[in-house]
């Protein structure tokens, strides 16, 4: 019988696109559908742009980064992510053992989709 190794949970950091520095190491993945305004490609030095893992345009527009809609947004986004298990696996495979550096543009670091996405990526 083959001995299956338990997969360890990935190490994930989130960082705003406007705050990233050359010294920020890891598998750099932009997790927004839209490119961050005013940011040059060279600045982010991306390994991947995972548009599919970002909230749908409809959900993003509905949410509008309104903290009062946060609870409902989380549930709706989790429902969208349930359909994206293949995209999740691809990202984790691509990152390998590297720390995943999730890059986003939102101003609010507490009420944005990367909070939900991080949990989704860490689930077994």
Q: Which ranges hold each PLM region?
A:
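Residues lining hydrophobic/aromatic ligand-binding pockets adjacent to catalytic sites
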Residues: 2-124
């Amino acid at each position: 019988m083959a001995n299956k190794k338990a997969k360890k949970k990935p190490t994930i950091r989130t960082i705003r696109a406007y705050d990233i520095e050359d010294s920020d190491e890891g598998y750099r993945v932009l997790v927004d559908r839209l490119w961050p305004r005013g940011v040059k490609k060279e600045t982010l030095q991306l390994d991947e742009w995972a548009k599919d893992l970002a909230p749908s345009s409809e959900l993003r527009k509905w949410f509008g980064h309104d903290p009062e809609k946060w609870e409902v947004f989380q549930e709706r986004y989790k429902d969208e992510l349930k359909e994206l298990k293949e995209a999740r696996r691809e990202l984790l495979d691509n990152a390998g053992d590297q720390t995943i550096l999730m890059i986003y543009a939102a101003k609010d670091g507490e009420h944005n989709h990367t909070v939900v996405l991080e949990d989704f990526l860490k689930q077994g």
